[in-house]
């Protein structure tokens, strides 16, 4: 059982590292999760790789018996990459580019993204392939989250046409017959005539839109598989996982298909986010946990468990004393075998300032610290039974194509 925190030492003065790791150890942790947003630190300029920062963090963590979950940093591309290859940025439906500064702003069909992501992942794997402290690799971060699962750029248009060309064996008439394009004079003479299903009068052909949903999913799954393959080519025994966000059934990506390329699934469990005035109900939280367990039909990790209020620019409900601890227990009861709290300490600047941590930004140990400490102390006693699989008596069957089809054509106001 791995018990830990998500630690971002790059946000803090180097002089704080030793005290941080001492306190993380006192908290009851045996692992830390690092590096998932550290691309610029590891490659400050194109081709100039420098792993010294995280080497030092790992070395000092190992001295305290802490193990490492290492994240590939592809969720946040560096500024120099966006400047050199602006086409790497994804596009909104109206054709405007997503600008550098957020996260997941890249296009999943960008050849440049594959090139540069491949370089940093390969360099990381080569550098850390003999590091025994690394217990797992996390590829990217929350793939498909926050509308990053949709892009309408020229690269996606050409890739979508290639996808359809392959699906229909280059036979455009087969596509016409399948889609029923003869109505509304939608018939195509060539795959290069096929548009992206952006805004139009009324709506696009539903079969075209369904294939677009399938294509969007495949684009993200392919990118995840690319990273897993790279890691395992260099580190054959690497344990590879991904931290899935909530709301998986509403994404433009089939997380069950993505999970086939992982050794196990992990989940970022947020009963509260942003301006929510109340947390999710216990049954909604349970559904999310069961969904993650069902992705590979096996136990899972929680890579982000909250301990304070959360949000990018606004917060709502703040967990009451022992409420976040209760959510952590609920996770363990539904198949979680290792858990990491997001995050060790809240930030004083930069993105996610309102994502509060185990410690607040003033670095003072208060109720939240001792709440996590007590949870870790208690849950260790159940490490062995929590490793056993959960055998459900009831199943909920879902299908990505069916969910997408209902998004496209709701059919009736009675089907809600």
Regions found by a protein language model. Name each.
Residues 11-26, 117-123, 246-258, 320-329:
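Short, acidic/polar
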Residues 8-10, 35-38, 71-80, 135-144, ...:
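Short, solvent-exposed turn/loop segments enriched in Gly/Ser/Thr/Pro and often Arg
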Residues 2-14, 35-54, 99-118, 143-149, ...:
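The substrate-binding groove and active-site-proximal loops of carbohydrate-active enzymes
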Residues 1, 28-30, 62-68, 130-135, ...:
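Short, well-ordered coil/turn segments that N-cap beta-strands
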Residues 18-98, 122-125, 226-235:
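Aromatic-lined substrate-binding rim segments of carbohydrate-active enzymes
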Residues 5, 24, 32, 61, ...:
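Conserved, mostly hydrophobic/aromatic
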Residues 94-264, 268-284:
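Polysaccharide-binding and catalytic clefts of secreted carbohydrate-active enzymes
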Residues 191-194, 263, 267-416:
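Carbohydrate-binding surfaces of carbohydrate-active enzymes
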